[in-house]
Regions:
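Short, acidic/small-residue loops that bind anionic groups at enzyme active sites
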Residues: 4-9, 53-78, 214-219
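Extended, charge-rich low-complexity interaction segments
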Residues: 37-42, 90-103, 243-264
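Short Gly/Thr/Asp-enriched flexible loops that form oxyanion-binding sites at enzyme active sites
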Residues: 42-56, 75, 200-206
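Short alpha-helices
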Residues: 64-104, 108-115
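Glycine-rich oxoanion-binding loops at beta->alpha junctions
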Residues: 2-29, 175
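Mixed-charge interfacial surface used for oligomerization/domain docking
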Residues: 98-203
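Short glycine-rich or small-residue beta-strand-to-loop segments that form or flank ligand, phosphate
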Residues: 1-4, 30-39, 46-49, 60-63, ...
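C-terminal non-catalytic interaction/assembly regions of soluble proteins
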Residues: 173-264
Length: 264
């Protein structure tokens, strides 16, 4: 991953910003845009890609749409892009470092997207600075299942349950969607939404590990922490990515970033 291009809080970057980021890391071999499936992001990255192509930069775009919670939402047409984005960036970055060409890396990214599934939940909302009020209201004894990363409410509100019950419900939605089957190897990610203590995320992972073992799914690698957040929202998401030996080799390749660091 050579460049990240954020917009304002919960706002897509502009085409000019994306084009500037693209040009700043162009080494002549082409650029892969990895875009979460939100309407503004997709539209602006499409415009930026066209601008970059007029300047002779080869562009490939892969849209991540791994969220099983919704087919359509306020911010997206089709499934939202969430946790699989992190896994795709790491794996594709390793492929680029290895010397794969642009088409190979884009095809690899599409495979990761096809084989990854995610779902999130929240106990609290978040407050967008420009609004100054929570994006939705929720009682202490309630929870939202299927929330988004821009403070969107979930697809279902229900009474608060135990960690085991919550993870059981979410993991079954994730597992049944691909579907994952006994014997599959996966990378599992438990991602905090910004306001959940790390100790609780490890508790969630323990429940996910138990469920995967019961289902016959082998967790080959795991990632636990705050990677795609929604300001101060208390909650988490789970992501499963089906992998083979080739993908695991790319995942295990050395990485040194503020959030991921191993093999160096």
């Amino acid at each position: 991953l050579d460049a990240a291009c954020p917009g304002d809080v919960f706002t897509s970057p502009t085409p000019d910003q994306i084009e500037a980021a693209t040009k700043s890391v162009n080494g002549g071999a082409g650029i892969l845009h990895i875009v979460k499936n939100y309407t503004g992001d997709v539209m602006n990255f499409e415009m930026a890609a066209e601008l970059s192509r007029t300047e002779g930069i080869e562009i490939e775009t892969v849209v991540i749409n791994d969220d099983v919670a919704v087919k359509d939402s306020l911010y997206t047409a089709g499934r939202r892009g969430v946790g699989t984005t992190v896994l795709a960036e790491k794996i594709c970055g390793a492929a680029a470092e290895r010397g794969d060409d642009l088409k190979q890396i884009a095809d690899l990214c599409r495979k990761v997207n096809e084989d990854g599934r995610s779902m999130g939940m929240a106990l609290t909302s978040c407050t967008v600075p420009s609004a100054g009020i929570p994006t939705f209201e929720i009682d202490d004894a309630e929870m939202e299942i299927g929330i988004g990363i821009h403070g969107e409410p979930g697809r279902e509100r229900m009474n608060l349950k135990t960690a085991g019950e919550i993870v059981e419900m979410m993991s079954q939605a994730v597992i049944s969607d691909l579907p994952f089957r006994g014997g599959d190897e996966v990378i599992a990610m438990v991602n905090g939404m910004g306001g959940t203590p790390l100790m609780e995320l490890y508790l969630v992972y323990g429940e996910l590990d138990r469920i995967c073992k019961k289902t016959g799914i082998r967790i080959a690698r795991r990632l636990i922490g705050n990677y795609i957040t929604s300001l101060e929202m208390a909650g988490f998401s789970i992501t499963l990515l089906k992998v083979d030996a080739a993908l695991l080799k790319l995942w295990d390749a050395p990485v040194r970033t503020p959030s991921l660091r191993w093999g160096v």
